Amino acid sequence: MTFNDKLQAYIQLTRFDKPVGIELLLWPTLWGVLFAAMGQAQQQGAGITAGLPSLSIFVIFALGAILMRAAGCAINDFADRKVDGHVSRTKGRPLADGRLSAKEAIAAFLVLVLLSASLLLFLPIQVFYWSFGAVILAFIYPFMKRYTHLPQVFLAAAFGWAIPMAYVAIQGAPDIWCWLLFLAYMCWTVAYDTQYAMADREDDIKIGVKSTAILFDRYDVIIISLLQTLFLVIMGAVMWHYFAPTSLGITPVFGLALVAMMFAKQNSACASRNALACFKAFLANIWVGRYVFVLIAIACIWTTFNG
């Protein structure tokens, strides 16, 4: 293989050529950063109701999300290297078609984890301790689909772990609102990753891979809808907590109505159980992440300067 061929294989291994996954991790991480900064400002009292995170914190967590998502993809392909070749959507992955070896995938995972760890040098030491949870969850998640029908829960925990880390970095420790935000993220992630699994359900059944799509069976869309509803309710409560004391009041909460409409459209598509329709519904969640980030960011900026 030429250098360019090998480089392309590594890019595909880490999914840098497919930014959808990056966004699904990046935006919720930044939700956590923004809310943690709001909480820190409100804890100071003296009538302060809002605040923004420092640019350095923002950049560190954004880079960390990008690198750890890439690391997660590398270890996922390592875990699935013997089954990806039997799934039409994944048979072209670099480990499945032999362009990269298992050792090269592990090496890529370790390099990306070390690069992510280097960012911790600029954060309080407590964040370093919390980061072990992220690494452990990212490593074990890909293997869970062999033993449980709930690998999506492990994925959600692995990707969502950046939220308590953001609170530790900014506030010193996670609080109840941090964990509610984490729970909301878990609900949303299990919902959209079930949509993703619905696209592969027939192949997964044939090769013995487990997923929530298989577990939920004909109740899949109903349970996805319930999880999305929980996300909206919990996220609404979190927004109420942070923005009710400000000049905006509960106005940002009403902004979640558009998310509800997005979810309704997704579920209408998934009701057909068509693999392509389910995959497109999954992809549509990047707009949920983007929109909620913009909603929170605008509210935080407005309240920081207008009270």
From Swiss-Prot:
Its cofactor is Mg(2+). InterPro entries: HB_polyprenyltransferase-like, Prenyltransferase, UbiA_prenyltransferase, UbiA_sf. It catalyses: all-trans-octaprenyl diphosphate + 4-hydroxybenzoate = 4-hydroxy-3-(all-trans-octaprenyl)benzoate + diphosphate. One of its GO terms (biological process) is ubiquinone biosynthetic process. Keywords: Cell inner membrane, Cell membrane, Magnesium, Membrane, Transferase, Transmembrane, Transmembrane helix, Ubiquinone biosynthesis. Pfam families: UbiA. Pathway: Cofactor biosynthesis; ubiquinone biosynthesis. One of its GO terms (molecular function) is 4-hydroxybenzoate polyprenyltransferase activity. It is found in: Cell inner membrane. It is a multi-pass membrane protein. PANTHER family: 4-HYDROXYBENZOATE POLYPRENYLTRANSFERASE, MITOCHONDRIAL, PRENYLTRANSFERASES. This is 4-hydroxybenzoate octaprenyltransferase. It comes from Psychrobacter cryohalolentis (strain ATCC BAA-1226 / DSM 17306 / VKM B-2378 / K5).
